[in-house]
């Protein structure tokens, strides 16, 4: 929708999502994080019998009419995720995220905190200082991607930028927060959920589209998994002629990317039977 709308505003113009689109993006990112925390994390971190589904089903964040800054959602997160009031938790995370997250998982009795505590030995040992996909305000990075997507249909299966494999995720929106290992990446899901719960206007996640001329446009949005890019080209009658999607997964699971490098490092960190 954003990419098509951008075609109507003229070449070189930036089109931003409207209020309903921003709300939909915010809801979906928040819910995706909650599902991953309470559905996937217990199984993947070796706690498959943890009774998480009843908690998730009762979460106000899954209600169809969820609105920004929901007090019910904030109270639920304080009880079942943070184990403490939200404001001091956020203050601690913003002041010294590394030290705060370590202190929090050792003190909080909540399921997410205890799962992270159990993942610390392995996750902390898996170091990853991979370059991240960063989008500039002028759209230069997106325009570079559009050149590749136009020239090569296979580009989206093995993307690169300037010959480099990049990664993207909620940790790549962390700004000055140092994210150098797998454990901190897992913990950033908690921080992201908390920041999203306090968002009052849907400004936490960025999205937009650029009109590139000649019936071509490129759109992006920040999702729970990272930056999602859509590129399209229409013919003279306005019908979609070519269309490509560049998902966060393609960056993160590139054969020479961050996950592949971490998997190669596993035999050095754990016994062969554990791998």
Language model: regions and residue ranges:
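Active-site bordering "gate/hinge" segments
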Residues: 1-225, 251-275
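Short beta-strand elements
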Residues: 228-247
